[in-house]
UniProtKB/Swiss-Prot annotation:
GO biological process, one term: carboxylic acid transport
Entry keyword annotation includes RNA-binding: no
Pfam families assigned to the protein according to its UniProt record, in alphabetical order: FUSC
Species this protein is from: Dickeya zeae (strain Ech586)
PANTHER family: MULTIDRUG RESISTANCE PROTEIN MDTO (PTHR30509:SF9), P-HYDROXYBENZOIC ACID EFFLUX PUMP SUBUNIT-RELATED (PTHR30509)
Name of this chain's protein: p-hydroxybenzoic acid efflux pump subunit AaeB
Function, as annotated: Forms an efflux pump with AaeA. Could function as a metabolic relief valve, allowing to eliminate certain compounds when they accumulate to high levels in the cell.
Location(s), subcellular: Cell inner membrane
Domain of life: Bacteria
Membrane topology summary: Multi-pass membrane protein
Entry keywords, A to Z: Cell inner membrane, Cell membrane, Membrane, Transmembrane, Transmembrane helix, Transport
TM regions (residue ranges): 12-32, 42-62, 66-86, 92-112, 114-134, 151-171, 368-388, 405-425, 429-449, 454-470, 481-501
Family classification: Belongs to the aromatic acid exporter ArAE (TC 2.A.85) family.
GO terms for MF: transmembrane transporter activity
Amino acid sequence: MINSPAFLRLRFAFKLSTAIVLSLVLGFHLQLETPRWAALTAAIVAAGPAFVAGGDPFSGAIRHRGMLRVIGTFIGCIGALVIIISTVRAPALMLLLCCLWAGVCVWISSLVKVENAYVFALAGYTTLIIIVTSQSEPLRILQFAVERCSEIVLGIVCAILADLLFSPRSIKQEIDRAVEELLVGQYHLLQRCVNGISKEELDAVWNGLVRKTHAINGMRSVLMMESSRWQGASRRITTLLTQSWVMITQACETRLTLQDHPNAVKGAIAVMLEQPAETPADVQRRLRQLRHLAAAHSRSLPPTLVSWLGAAARYQLLAKGVKTNVRISQSEAVLLDADIPVKASSAETHHAMINGVRTTVATGLGCLFWLWTGWTSGSVCMVMLAVVTSLAMRLPNPLMAAKDFLIGTLVALPLGALMFMLVLPSTQQSLLLLCLSLGGVAFVIGIEVQKRRLGSLGALASTINILVLSNPMKFNLSQFLDNAIGQVIGCILALSVILLIRDNTREQTSRTLLNRFVFGAVSALSTRPAQRQENHLPALYQHLFLLLNLFPGEIGKYRLALSLIMMHQRLRTLVLPVSPTLSAFHRQMRATAEQVIGSTRDRSLHFSRLLAQMDEYQQLLRDHQVSDEAIDAVGRLTALLHRHQHALGD
């Protein structure tokens, strides 16, 4: 009953209503000039994570979002003060700098991690809000900035209190369940790779495992928002995910080995891998039996299968620690310290630049429209332009996000009119009636937000934004209509800019991602022990996950990326002699691979040079009397790059 979907939806709806009503009551009690901002902040902070999660958000999500909003607001206020002090004598230049500032903030938000992007997006449009709304009274800019920060902090505190009051859910149980299911999925992938599977079935299986592993990483971030007592579990999960990437890679490589040597896995191990195992307990029992058999027949087994079993053993050890959250043991500490993940740099630099240009152009057009028409509510249009372009650009589908805002503002027009003309005037003698009316509206919209109904989140924010909710309340019908229509026009302009300034960087992003895989394979060639310990798998699979999302259905790119990841893992285990000549050549190849990633016009030239260096490197290995296994592995990578030269270098 308590964990039923219906109960959770009702609980969040009560939580959202409580946050909005509490912020409004405290705003009036503290004599704030515009308690609307506190209510609007509480609504956005509480409803935003619920819309993303599609239900009641887990513990820590609202608190984390609130802290990001505080930081972004303070950055935006400081930016507004600096711009106004610097350009107080040139209002047109002031607005131009605001537009540029908003574009730069959106550009930065498109490059940083998704969970931190909200800070910079908010900083961009907060500066614009402060400057635009203070144009009539520029001498009150400092007072307005302080009041804005106070109202936002009040709204955030109310959202957090409401979240704590209605018992937020912990994501820990979901993580434990997902970790067990992931191990079962990994074992099924190994079974199918050993027993034979078509390419199409293999693509579907490893695609699902990549998404499940990435989802657990997202859950880990939410767990860290919940409490600091999960730091040990978070460290274990990070290394556990590395073992998951290793298992996916080694299982797929085992399949390739069996294609060349069909009898590489035989006897009792082959028979055991044919036996079904559906539950976590069955998989743990099978793995224990496989390790015993592998210990007795390790020399006759493919190295990739032995490596897979080792990764599975490490996975089980870490999964036990994640579930119990006990103090990190010595054996676990060795695993955690040995894992040195390489951070993945953004492959969407051009996409980020387009997002920044869209925001700058949209806000600039809004400024021109405002100055040209002299519209009294042009500031509302400007604010909506900045909000839509700042928040929509970081999402996978900015166009759909802009449509959501537009539908929300259209719904807010009749809903807000009903509240403004009938409900609010009838509640002027009773704060209780005012709270009940707004709480009822928030309750209904809160249920729709959890269903991710198109326009629900935009309707909630837009309705609160156009209502009076000031101290004292003033019912000016013409101003209400101006504000409501200004919101709609702002969303239409933002949608038009997104449609007109098209993002044609998808193909460039695709080649950048694929060449990142090439660089990962080349960087595995090293004679330095410290560099060989660097773990590129999390970064490579993060790029693969982005590739899956940006180019759904393009199987050829997925297979090429996975092949390069397998080459990276194979080359990383090669034993190369310590030689200044080899070390210098490794640095030269890495530099060329980096040039392939960064170049646009001369990519084909740099890629041809990399292929020539790979051919020369094989001869260099023969001169140093390196094992045939290492030379063959480098030859496979070279042949793979030659086969896909058009996709990687043109």
